[in-house]
């Protein structure tokens, strides 16, 4: 059969091109109907998993809250690190990735290495959407995103030897209105 004849047959809708599918006609309608009556016979193994949720930790209750895999419900951990060199900083990043809070005491390090260490861990903390807080002199707290950090310290009161005044006298106000004298000397009066 030539190509032109086949095209004519397709356009005209001749049935002789459908002869390849005639072997399906050998099945009787009764066999198809019998198969449709029992659909469980043809279901896959995935249907048995449709009723179970592997992430459900509620124990069969009707709660809409599901657990996240990989996150333990154990108590939170805090790692206190006193590194002596920058080479120990990847341990702090790994602890943050494991959702542990890290407190770095950098008093044992040189100041330039300590600055580098803080920058490195702060970058890692930022990458995981964590929080950082300066706790004291060369002591820093880094927490993952699952930990909320709040600062409950209030501003320290002024020492007793420092007095603050809120009212200004008229002399002080009048002095502040005049222009200050230049630091290089008194201005010379210009001749008119």
UniProtKB/Swiss-Prot annotation:
GO terms for cellular component: cytoplasm. InterPro entries: Cell_div_SepF, Cell_div_SepF/SepF-rel, SepF-like_sf. The keyword Isomerase does not apply. Residues 154-192 are annotated as: Disordered. Gene3D superfamilies: SepF-like protein (3.30.110.150). It is found in: Cytoplasm. Residues 162-178 have a biased composition (Low complexity). Transmembrane segments: none annotated. It comes from the Bacteria. Belongs to the SepF family. Homodimer. Interacts with FtsZ. HAMAP family: SepF (MF_01197). This is Cell division protein SepF. It comes from Prochlorococcus marinus (strain MIT 9211). The gene is sepF.
